[in-house]
């Protein structure tokens, strides 16, 4: 019997230790946020935990973060952690998964609060600050020019030569203003295009076509009345799941709620059964909603619900 490559990939991924974090602006640099989960730490020796963690994101950039320890837990040192957070403009309830690849190197996947995975670096806060500073200097210069023009008018009658110079100066000022407006419009358009390129998610059609994804798998489904008790899983997505009954963890995008749901394999397909009804009540999920599931680890999914 031929083996399923997607299932083998998930099976191999399951052997790798991983943990997740949800970053909120209010406490994204606190020691608790930087803590490394105990269930993860116990798989490593003290020697391994005395060095650095290396983070690598989907677009190839990497960061080194030192590990420290207090009487209660291991945690990531603030300097390296904050550089990673600032460089990626994090802090808006992003969902991060850290998968160990050996020798304290980690693949980090970043999901925005709408469930989309970041595939390219966002425009950094530093560049925002830089553009704001340039804009401010231009505005100040423009204001100074306007003040000079107003002052010249307040001095009373002028000669013909002065009038000509004033007209030339006014045309120059208007041209500069028009040029600045065109530049700002171009920058806004460029930022919008970059933002669209930054985020990518595997669409429902791609998963249904059975095309394997090297980055993220997921599906969308409309909730009918019967789907409140148990949820049928699209067959192509089932290729990423185990071939036997197991328990999976489903996360709310706020990072504070999780549910354990039984994944059942039947002759007619796979379903979410035990625990699903409770999830629908607590999330909540109701008839008419659209659920988007994103596979973040082999046995963990992120659920984002859209209301009609």
From Swiss-Prot:
Stretches with biased composition (Basic and acidic residues): 134-145, 178-198
GO molecular function: DNA binding
Domain of life of the organism encoding this protein: Eukaryota
Basic residues bias: start-end ranges: 168-177
SMART domains linked: B3 (SM01019)
Keyword Ribosomal protein: no
Stored Pfam families: B3
UniProt DNA-binding residue ranges: 19-114, 216-308
Gene Ontology cellular component list: nucleus
Cell location: Nucleus
Designated name of the protein: B3 domain-containing protein REM23
Species of the source: Arabidopsis thaliana
């Amino acid at each position: 019997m031929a083996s399923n490559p997607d299932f083998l990939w998930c099976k191999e991924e399951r052997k790798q230790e991983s943990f997740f974090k949800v970053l909120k602006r209010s406490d994204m640099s606190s020691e608790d946020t930087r803590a490394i989960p105990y269930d993860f730490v116990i798989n490593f020796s003290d020697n391994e935990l005395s060095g650095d963690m290396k983070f690598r994101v989907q677009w190839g950039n990497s960061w080194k973060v030192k590990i420290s320890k207090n009487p209660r837990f291991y945690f990531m040192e603030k300097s390296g952690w904050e550089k990673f957070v600032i460089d990626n403009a994090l802090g808006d309830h992003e969902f991060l998964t850290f998968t160990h690849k050996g020798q304290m190197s980690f693949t980090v996947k970043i999901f925005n609060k709408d469930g989309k995975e970041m595939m390219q670096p966002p425009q950094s806060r530093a560049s925002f600050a830089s553009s704001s500073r340039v804009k401010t200097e231009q505005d100040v210069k423009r204001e100074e020019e306007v003040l000079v023009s107003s002052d010249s008018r307040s001095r009373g009658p002028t000669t013909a030569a002065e009038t000509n110079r004033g007209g030339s100066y006014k045309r120059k000022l208007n041209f500069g203003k028009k040029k600045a407006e065109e530049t700002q419009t171009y920058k806004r358009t460029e930022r919008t295009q970059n933002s669209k390129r930054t985020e990518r998610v595997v669409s429902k059609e791609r998963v249904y076509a059975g095309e394997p994804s090297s980055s993220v798998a997921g599906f969308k489904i409309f909730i009918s009345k019967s789907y409140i008790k148990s949820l049928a899983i699209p067959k192509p997505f089932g290729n990423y799941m185990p071939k036997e009954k197991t328990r999976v963890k489903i996360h709310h995008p706020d990072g504070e709620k999780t549910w354990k749901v039984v994944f059942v394999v039947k002759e007619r397909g796979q379903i979410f059964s035990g625990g699903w009804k409770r999830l629908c009540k607590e999330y909540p999920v109701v008839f008419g909603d659209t659920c988007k599931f994103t596979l973040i680890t082999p046995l963990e999914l992120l659920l984002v619900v859209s209301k009609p």
